[in-house]
Amino acid sequence: MSDVTTAEFNEEGKYLRKVRSFVLREGRLTKGQAQAMEQQWPSMGLDYTPEAIDLVEVFGREADTVLEIGFGMGGSLVEMAKASPELNFIGIEVHKPGVGACLSVAAEAGVTNLRVYHHDALEVLENSIAEGSLARVQLFFPDPWHKKRHHKRRIVQAPFAELIRSKLKVGGVFHLATDWENYSEHMLEVMTAAPGYKNQSATGDVVERPEHRPLTKFEARGHRLGHGVWDLMFERV
């Protein structure tokens, strides 16, 4: 579930209020998660500040940076970081047990190219990430808010697409994935209408799951049951 507060607008684009696109269910940390938070946070954790971070200073090198919004328990994010040591990875997650789990798995995997925020993603994106600094932004399996009256809570809306674009460098990619077909249609509609993006799909809709996105256990089970997953990739132009 994605950890973002997103703005609600009326049909004329007038700002109404902010609504949560996630439900905060703060569970207790396991002993291992708590230990990981204590031991790994100094090296992998990023404390939120309202100023843009210096990526070279944070990672100690110049490299393309990938940011994931709402990484859950972090297994896939760590897998991606381990598979692509030439890239920098930043994950944002509002649920503390997920952050602890991610840090634990990252330490076990020995990755050094991953940093994580335990904070609201919209605030991080707006204030802590410099414009034009990201090579890729990932939003995998956000809450679909499948009831129609809750669609306004979906994170993928026009203002959000505009915010993501401002943080991507030219040629950078916004990669979305969902296992809810109606949400994939909503994503496609929003992203197609968003200025300054080019759909990487040759057919103008979805793409095959790229190799860089690991197949999750949940997703693999869904495949066996005949459930679909839809990937969308839009490039900043």
UniProtKB/Swiss-Prot annotation:
Q: SUPFAM superfamilies this protein is in? A: S-adenosyl-L-methionine-dependent methyltransferases (SSF53335)
Question: Which Pfam family, just one, is annotated for this protein?
Answer: Methyltransf_4
Q: Which keywords does this Swiss-Prot/TrEMBL entry list? A: Methyltransferase, S-adenosyl-L-methionine, Transferase, tRNA processing
Q: Which organism is it from?
A: Shewanella piezotolerans (strain WP3 / JCM 13877)
Any one GO MF term held by the record is:
tRNA (guanine(46)-N7)-methyltransferase activity
Q: Which gene encodes it?
A: trmB
Its pathway, per UniProt, is:
tRNA modification; N(7)-methylguanine-tRNA biosynthesis
Q: What does this protein do?
A: Catalyzes the formation of N(7)-methylguanine at position 46 (m7G46) in tRNA.
Q: Which GO terms describe its cellular component?
A: tRNA methyltransferase complex
InterPro entries found in the cross-reference section: SAM-dependent_MTases_sf (IPR029063), tRNA_(Gua-N-7)_MeTrfase_Trmb (IPR003358), tRNA_methyltr_TrmB_bact (IPR055361)
Q: Which residues are catalytic?
A: 143
State the protein's name: tRNA (guanine-N(7)-)-methyltransferase
